């Protein structure tokens, strides 16, 4: 959905509140004006044929519970950051294995960016197993809940390791797929490798 008076232009979904409609502030990931997006920036940035099809396929999802679901459209910053991260991950698998840092400010939708990234990574890297490791139990629970609410979009049900042994079990014999959540506290120095994958 788009709302516009040709001065202010915003996009959202049929379930978005007015406060959730967002401007698309770039044509090509270079930020031309971060205060207000121009009319042509919004339309050329979001409605290029190839990009629009990509947004419709990979950057709109349903989240929430079975009784309270809502449709979410990625913001421009999420779209370009995730696309760049996917290209970097593909390159990393062929070179040094270093994917880089994905940075967003507080409240900018990092959890959803991670969901979009995991969704695209499944295709880009031929069904990898993704281990999401955090440094806080509350963050682990928060991310696990967000990913679980997006299980249909991810085409798999995320798993949360309850212990080091449980994590080993979840990884053991797995040759593809899986999104597994854990905390770094389950590891100790000098410990043997949990999985050769």
Enumerate the predicted regions with their spans.
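Acidic/polar loop patches that form or flank catalytic/metal-binding clefts of enzymes
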Residues: 154-160
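SF2 helicase catalytic motif II
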Residues: 197
């Amino acid at each position: 959905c788009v709302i516009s008076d040709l001065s202010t232009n915003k996009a959202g979904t049929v379930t978005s509140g007015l406060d959730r409609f967002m401007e698309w502030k770039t044509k090509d990931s270079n930020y031309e004006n971060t205060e207000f997006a121009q009319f042509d920036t919004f339309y050329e940035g979001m409605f290029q044929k190839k990009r629009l099809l990509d947004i419709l396929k990979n950057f709109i999802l349903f989240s929430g519970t079975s009784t309270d679901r809502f449709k979410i459209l990625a913001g421009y910053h999420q779209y370009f950051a995730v696309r760049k991260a996917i290209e970097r991950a593909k390159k990393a698998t062929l070179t040094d294995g270093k994917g880089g840092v994905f940075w967003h400010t507080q409240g900018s939708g990092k959890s959803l960016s991670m969901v979009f990234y995991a969704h695209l990574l499944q295709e880009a890297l031929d069904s990898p197993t993704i281990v999401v490791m955090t440094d806080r139990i509350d963050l682990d629970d928060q991310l696990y809940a967000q990913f679980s609410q997006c299980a249909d979009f991810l085409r798999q049900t995320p798993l949360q390791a309850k212990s080091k042994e449980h994590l080993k079990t979840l990884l053991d014999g797995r040759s593809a797929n899986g999104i597994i959540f854990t905390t770094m506290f389950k590891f100790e120095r000098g410990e043997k490798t949990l999985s050769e994958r």
